[in-house]
Amino acid sequence: MIGQLMNLKATELCLGLPGGAEAVESPAKSAVGSKRGFSETVDLMLNLQSNKEGSVDLKNVSAVPKEKTTLKDPSKPPAKAQVVGWPPVRNYRKNMMTQQKTSSGAEEASSEKAGNFGGGAAGAGLVKVSMDGAPYLRKVDLKMYKSYQDLSDALAKMFSSFTMGNYGAQGMIDFMNESKLMNLLNSSEYVPSYEDKDGDWMLVGDVPWEMFVESCKRLRIMKGSEAVGLAPRAMEKYCKNRS
């Protein structure tokens, strides 16, 4: 029965061109197929784009930490530009050498200042004092004294066993008295002399005190017999300086 119906349907007459039924059915099938093909192509394109985006992100993510590690990696050796000299010496060693030189220079300068009692003015007044027959030297600061009287008292205390004689301490006080000077020069007593800026030796007391302090470089207490030639030359030089 079913077979007869199918045969009847197949032989049934209908309006339209031959093969129309197949043509009507085929568009639906083609539409369905086209829909499936479009959806598949869209899905494929989306998958490809997502894969591309994911790959780019991975590259960026992997590249960023590399840059950070290169910048902040403390374990890497320093660049070759930091090595100087041969054998290679690093910059910090070179800097330490310069610092040591500057510190040594500062220490030398401070020691010189300490030797000069902390200043140029005080160092200019500091002179050595020697005495013939004395096994030691002394230093006096001429700026601490205001006159020949004060200086003679200080020298008498320093070399008391040598300066005390027939004249006692008076032989070193009145330097400007010519008669006493000549008596000292003709005797065996000790008289004080000094070396001026020109390198000449003169008797202490032949020039005013201020000039003596400025020109004195060294003091020497010598025997009067050895200082005979100093008195006339000292007076002559003082007269030339005044003129």
Curated annotation (Swiss-Prot):
Keywords: Auxin signaling pathway, Nucleus, Repressor, Transcription, Transcription regulation
InterPro entries: AUX/IAA_dom (IPR033389), AUX_IAA (IPR003311), PB1-like (IPR053793)
GO cellular component: nucleus
Tissue-level expression: Highly expressed in stems and flowers.
Cellular compartment(s): Nucleus
GO biological process terms held by the UniProt record: auxin-activated signaling pathway; gravitropism; response to auxin; response to jasmonic acid; response to water deprivation; response to wounding
GO terms of molecular function: DNA-binding transcription factor activity; transcription cis-regulatory region binding
Residue stretches making up the PB1 domain: 124-224
Keyword Transmembrane helix listed: no
Pfam family for this entry, one: AUX_IAA
Subunit structure: Homodimers and heterodimers.
Domains: entry comment: The N-terminal half of the protein contains two conserved domains I and II. Domain I includes a slightly degenerated ERF-associated amphiphilic repression (EAR) motif which seems to be involved in the activity of transcriptional repression. Domain II is required for the correct degradation of the protein through the SCF-mediated ubiquitin-proteasome pathway. Interactions between Aux/IAA proteins and auxin response factors (ARFs) occur through their C-terminal dimerization domains III and IV.
Similarity remark: Belongs to the Aux/IAA family.
Name the record gives this protein: Auxin-responsive protein IAA7
Organism for this UniProt entry: Arabidopsis thaliana
The encoding gene: IAA7
